[in-house]
A protein has these predicted regions:
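N-terminal secretory signal peptides that target proteins for export/translocation
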Residues: 1-7
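Basic side chains
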Residues: 3, 109, 224, 262, ...
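Bacterial N-terminal signal peptides
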Residues: 8-20
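Intrinsic disorder/low-complexity segments enriched in polar/charged and small flexible residues
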Residues: 10, 25-27, 150, 157, ...
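Extracellular glycan-recognition regions
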Residues: 25-238
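Central antiparallel beta-sheet cores of small beta-barrel/beta-sandwich binding domains
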Residues: 233-343
Length: 343
């Protein structure tokens, strides 16, 4: 039964193994990679050089070819939760006068060169005259399925943000990961530049890597990985059942019931709540991660616009008998949802 309604609503890879792994310690202690040389590094589609850049030793990565990106996997890393710190810099190699935002970042929980979570930055967007470009200075992605284009189109402004950055300048990054949440900090700030509540990657642990793009020189130095006690999580929870759900956003919130069924990776069911009763749900399931859609009806008593048909999109993780994620009523409201399975 519906509850009351309140006012609502890829990757071409470069794999680099750092020779500084001799300084890496066990996963229970901090692992430090100064990246002072290229001894033992293994590269694909990239040229690597040990350099001194802006006064500090670093590894420079340049991606071979006219288009593509690359990831540098640090050996001996098996990261789940904790902190990753690094210093990065970027120098564009495009002709003078060509606008280039730049792309350089840190990947984590990497299974291989195409499956990973990642934060990257676009220093050239930080001081752009167009505010829209400024809003695209910091980015989260999850390969191979959730690139920047898909995330921006499906969840505008959720997985990218502004940030104080500059070309040809060392930037300190800090990534904090706890379960399905990750935060990115810039240059020692106590406030995160981007918070991702609901990481979309397929794996709960994996390697840490350095990421670069074509038309630039990317520099990396002083990577430090500090593990923390891992949150107890397990992928693969089923979505089938009756779910009591709460949701909300800037335009308000409410409650609903979802009755869901799953056959392999296909999900079907119904939604009953403020946006309609018995509305047909379709979607997908991937190892506990779900994407659900249905056609709803914006309520007549809402103060947030005229009534009419709406498209609703939910995405999130099932963890045992609980679930949470993001909800979008396209063009009307965006927010979060959480649910419990009725037993």
């Amino acid at each position: 039964m519906a509850r009351s309604f309140v006012g609502w609503m890829t990757l071409g890879a470069v794999i680099v193994l750092s020779s500084t792994c001799a300084l890496a310690q066990t996963t229970q202690k901090a692992q430090v990679f100064p990246l002072r040389d290229t001894v033992g590094l293994i590269a694909t589609k990239a040229k690597m050089d040990p350099v001194t850049y802006l006064g500090r030793p670093a590894v420079r990565l340049t991606v071979e070819g006219e288009d593509g990106d690359g990831i540098a996997i640090l050996p001996g890393t098996d990261f789940q939760d904790g902190t990753i710190e690094a210093e990065i810099a970027l120098k564009p190699t495009t002709p003078p006068g060509v606008r280039y935002p730049g792309f350089v970042g840190i990947a984590f929980r990497s299974r291989d060169a195409s499956h990973f979570e990642m934060f990257y930055v676009r220093p050239g967007n930080s001081a752009a005259p167009d505010q829209l470009q400024r809003n695209h200075a910091v980015q989260y992605v999850a390969g191979p399925d959730f690139g920047w284009y898909r995330l921006r189109r499906e969840w505008p402004s959720v997985y990218e943000s502004t940030g104080e950055l500059a070309m040809e300048t060392w930037t300190k990054l800090k990534i904090e990961v706890a379960g399905r949440t990750a935060k990115l900090y810039l240059n020692g700030s106590s406030k995160p530049s981007l918070v991702v509540d609901g990481l979309k990657g397929e794996d709960l642990h994996g390697s840490v890597g350095l990421w670069s793009f074509t038309n630039e020189e990317s520099y990396f130095s002083n990577v430090r990985i500090t593990p923390a006690a891992a949150m107890k999580l397990e992928n693969g929870s089923d979505v089938a059942g009756v779910w009591e759900l709460q949701f909300g956003g800037d335009a308000g919130g409410g409650g609903a019931t979802m009755e869901l069924r799953r056959e392999e990776d296909k999900v079907t069911g119904t939604w009953s709540g403020p946006l309609g009763t018995g509305r047909e749900i379709t979607g997908t399931w991937r190892n506990g991660y779900v994407e659900l859609i249905f056609a709803g009806e914006w309520p007549k008593d809402s103060r947030q616009g005229a009534p009419g048909p709406v498209h609703v999109h939910l995405a999130g993780w099932i963890d045992g008998n609980t679930a949470k994620g993001r909800i979008s009523v396209v063009g009307r409201n965006d927010g979060q949802w959480s649910a419990k399975r009725k037993e």
